[in-house]
Amino acid sequence: MHNEKGKNGDEYRHDAFIMPKMRSKLQKPKLYRVLLLDDDYTPMDFVIFVLKSFFKKNFEEAMHIMLSVHQNGVGECGIYNYEVAEMKIIQVRECARQNEHPLQCVMEWK
C-alpha cells in the first residue's frame, strides 16, 4: 500500500485506484469488398463519375476499375468495414437510380 501525507497531515492511499492489468480482447472489424457489377446499359463515363465521387478515386484509378468492370464483369471499388461499405452501396444505388442507370453495387466479405 502506498501512502502520502497531504498538506494537513492526512494520509492518501494510492492503491485503491490502481486497476489490475487486463488483456484487451478487441478484435479487428471484418472487412468487406465493395464491388461494381457490369451491365449493358450504364455508360462508362457514369461509372468513372461514381468512382471519383463516392470512392475518391483519381481518374487513372477510376479508369482502371471501370475497365475491370467492363472486361471482367466486376470491379473492386475498395475495402471497408461493414457500416462504411453499406453507406457506399446506398450512395451508389441512389445516384444510379436518380440518373436512371441500372448500375449495381454489392459487398462481399473479404
Swiss-Prot record:
Superkingdom of this protein's organism: Bacteria
SUPFAM superfamilies for this protein: ClpS-like
GO biological process, one term: protein catabolic process
InterPro entries registered for this protein in UniProt: ClpS, ClpS_core, Ribosomal_bL12_C/ClpS-like
Family: Belongs to the ClpS family.
Role played: Involved in the modulation of the specificity of the ClpAP-mediated ATP-dependent protein degradation.
Subunit comment: Binds to the N-terminal domain of the chaperone ClpA.
The protein's name: ATP-dependent Clp protease adapter protein ClpS
Annotated source species: Bartonella henselae (strain ATCC 49882 / DSM 28221 / CCUG 30454 / Houston 1) (Rochalimaea henselae)
Gene name, Swiss-Prot/TrEMBL: clpS
